[in-house]
Amino acid sequence: MPTRRGSCVLHLLSSQEPDFLSAHQEALRFLQDLVRIDTSSPPGNETEAARYIQGVLAYEGIESQIYEREPGRGNLVARLEGNGSKRPILLMGHLDVVGVEPDAWTEEPFGAVIKDGYLYGRGSQDDKGMVAVALEVFLMLHRSGMELDRDVILMAEAGEEGSPQLGVQYMIDEHFPEIDAEFALNEGGSIIQQNDRWVVSVATTEKVSRRCASSPTAPQATGRGHCRTIPSYTWPLPWPSSVVGNTP
């Protein structure tokens, strides 16, 4: 089952135009609530976050199941049924987060404080933001009442941060029919980031013909000369090197 990484916009074809502003505000509330649930891995505690989502879905009349390989490491799965003319699509994201060093934070890492237009909190991007958006899209589809050509599956998984045997691998091994889909929409994409460039030292061994270093027949006739021919490479940017204007 391939995973398509990146952003996805679902165009909802219904008789009533979706209220995207309300959807944004609701998704933001979901995100804040999820961030405030400490799911640092280890120990994880994803089941508490899964139960929160289960409560949201139950309020809308949507059934869901939580699957655990170990106590507290829950994976939530819910499904909207389509007419079956196409294979399902899977909306997914993970509930666990990397541990924090509180002293390194300017805001409480599980406070989900919004300040100057930014939400501060562990997991706000990786990956509870994705979970909140997937949940909102799932609810919008349900509320629209539109006929779906395919089932839409929502999975909020455990164990992505180093313990896939408790999350997606467990679901594949033990409950694959529940998540079997034509493709999945997961986290990822070309996000502008800092501090992702590293210095790497590389040692190589060059095999060349024996020559006297004082009279090589070509620049690459000696190992040192050969190494000098290794070109440097700069990756071209597919976008302008400067950003002009404001982004929403």
State the predicted function of each range.
Residues 73, 86, 107, 149, ...:
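Short, solvent-exposed loop/turn segments at the edges of secondary structure
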Residues 12-124, 141-150:
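Acidic/His- and Gly-rich active-site-bordering loop/insert found
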Residues 119, 125-202:
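Acidic/histidine-rich catalytic neighborhood of metal-dependent amide-processing enzymes
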Residues 196-198, 215-222:
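Flexible glycine/proline-enriched surface loops and loop-helix/loop-strand junctions
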Residues 176, 190-196, 203-205, 209, ...:
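Acidic-enriched catalytic cores of C-N bond-cleaving enzymes acting on peptides and small amides
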Residues 28-31, 47-50, 54, 131, ...:
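Extracytoplasmic/secreted envelope proteins and their assembly/folding machinery
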